[in-house]
């Protein structure tokens, strides 16, 4: 996980714990900005997944031509990175859903 992603999770968790206070508009703006940052990170992860899947397809296509020359190390690395991206994307989506629900609840209460 990058420092940027760690910082994003810290911001999200702080917003989930923090009381909106008297300045609900300011708080909601921070929530919305953080949601936007989170969605942008999710898009980056999706793009990375697509890139990894394409590379895996290229490598497995080559296996049909010459199975003895299989790039097993690269396939293993790609599989691990793909699994990591899937896990992070799932975690991020869940965390963003909680933040989105919080924003909705604050808007409804206003």
Where are these regions (language model features)?
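Eukaryotic long, low-complexity intrinsically disordered regulatory regions enriched in serine/proline
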Residues: 1-10
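Short, charge-rich amphipathic alpha-helices with coiled-coil/heptad character
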Residues: 9-36, 66, 107-110
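Residue preference for a single heptad-register face of alpha-helical coiled-coils
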Residues: 16, 23, 30-33, 37, ...
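Extended alpha-helical coiled-coil "stalk/arm" regions
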Residues: 49-75
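Long amphipathic alpha-helical coiled-coil segments
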Residues: 61, 89-110
